Amino acid sequence: MAVLVVFLSFLVADVFGNEFSILRSPGSVVFRNGNWPIPGERIPDVAALSMGFSVKEDLSWPGLAVGNLFHRPRATVMVMVKGVDKLALPPGSVISYPLENAVPFSLDSVANSIHSLFSEETPVVLQLAPSEERVYMVGKANSVFEDLSVTLRQLRNRLFQENSVLTSLPLNSLSRNNEVDLLFLSELQVLRDISSLLSRHKHLAKDHSPDLYSLELAGLDEIGKHYGEDSEQFRDASKILIDALQKFADDMYNLYGGNAVVELVTVRSFDTSLVRKTRNILETKQVKDPSTTYNLAYKYNFEYPVVFNLVLWIMIGLALTLIVTCYNIWNMDPGYDSIIYRMTNQKIRMD
C-alpha cells in the first residue's frame, strides 16, 4: 500500500509538476487565485482571450475571468523556461496554476490574429528562442530590434561588450569561460536588451495596436544537464533567473504603462507522447485525413471575392467588345464604310 501511495504521488507530481504563472497583469484582465490545472495546448487560447481575440473552441477554465471588454492590454509577454517544473517566485505578487499535458505550443495563432486585425498599424510581434537561433520579427519589430543579438555568435560577442550582464550580475559559481554558462547568461542578456531597446522607442508602447512577445529560454535546462540539478551552479542559476525575470516583468509592465500581461511557463520536459507524430511519405499504408472525407471547401482569403469580381467583369467586357468589333468588321462595306477605299475612289476621280 505504501508503495502504491508513493507511486501515485510521483505520478501526480509528474503530471502537474509544471506551472503556468502570471507575473504581471492589468486590472482589465482578471486572473483568479486557485489550483485549477490548465492544459498545455490551451495556453495560446488563454493569451488570445486575455487580449480580446476569439478562439475556435470555448475555454472552460475558471482561472481567467471576464474582464473589461473595452479596455484590453496593449501587450502580452510570454516567457517559457525549460528544464524546471517551477521557480521559487516571491509569493503574493504571482498567480500560479498547475500545467497538465505539457506539450509544445506556439503563439502563431495569436500573431495571425494581430496581423489580420491590425495590418495597417504594423504592431510589434517578436518570437525568439536564443538557444535554437530561432527568431521571428514582423511589423515594427524589424526596425526596433534590428540590433538584437539572435545567433549564438552574436550572443557571445554581446556578453563581452560594455553594459552586459557579466558586469552587473553576481555569477557566484557560474563561470564566464564555460559555454553552458555563457548560453544561460546570453539569454538573460536578451531579456535586458529587449527592454532596453523598447525603452528607446516608447512610442510603440503607446499606440493602439497590441504587441506580442514570446521568448523560450533553455539555458537553465542545459545547466541542469551539465552540472546536475543538485549542483551549486544550478541553484545559483535559478536564483539569477528569478531576479532577471522579475526585473524584466517590471520593465515591460512599466513601459506599457501598466497595461501588459506578463506570463511565465515552466516546463521540465515536454510530453512527446502527446505530440502528433509525422509519417514517412514512403510508407505504403497512409492514414487518410478525416477532414477530406467531408469534401470541405478551401479557405480563401477575404479579398478573394473582390479580385474575382474584378477579373470576371473585365473579361466579360473585353469579350463583348471583341464580339462587337468582329461583327462590325464582318458586315462592313469596303466601298461605303471604309475611309481608305472612299479616299482612294475620290483620288481616282480627280486623276
UniProtKB/Swiss-Prot annotation:
Any idea where this protein resides?
Endoplasmic reticulum membrane; Lysosome membrane; Cytoplasmic vesicle, Autophagosome membrane; Cell projection, Dendritic spine membrane
An annotated GO BP: positive regulation of Wnt signaling pathway
Annotated transmembrane regions: 304-324
| Any one GO molecular-function label of the UniProt entry | signaling receptor activity
Positions on the Extracellular side per record topology: 18-303
* Expression sites by tissue: Expressed in the brain.
Source organism, top-level taxon: Eukaryota
Q: Which residues form the signal peptide?
A: 1-17
Task: Choose one Gene Ontology CC annotation of this protein and give it.
Answer: postsynaptic membrane
Motif Mediates retrograde transport to the ER: which residue numbers?
347-351
Pfam families given for it?
A: Renin_r (PF07850), RENR_N (PF25294)
Q: Kindly state the subunit structure of this protein.
A: Interacts with renin. Accessory component of the multisubunit proton-transporting vacuolar (V)-ATPase protein pump. Interacts (via N-terminus) with ATP6AP1 (via N-terminus). Interacts with ATP6V0D1; ATP6V0D1 is a V-ATPase complex subunit and the interaction promotes V-ATPase complex assembly. Interacts with TMEM9; TMEM9 is a V-ATPase assembly regulator and the interaction induces the interaction with ATP6V0D1. Interacts with VMA21 (via N-terminus); VMA21 is a V-ATPase accessory component.
Function text: Multifunctional protein which functions as a renin, prorenin cellular receptor and is involved in the assembly of the lysosomal proton-transporting V-type ATPase (V-ATPase) and the acidification of the endo-lysosomal system. May mediate renin-dependent cellular responses by activating ERK1 and ERK2. By increasing the catalytic efficiency of renin in AGT/angiotensinogen conversion to angiotensin I, may also play a role in the renin-angiotensin system (RAS).
**Protein name (record):** Renin receptor
Q: What is the lineage of its organism?
A: Eukaryota, Metazoa, Chordata, Craniata, Vertebrata
What gene is this protein translated from?
Answer: ATP6AP2
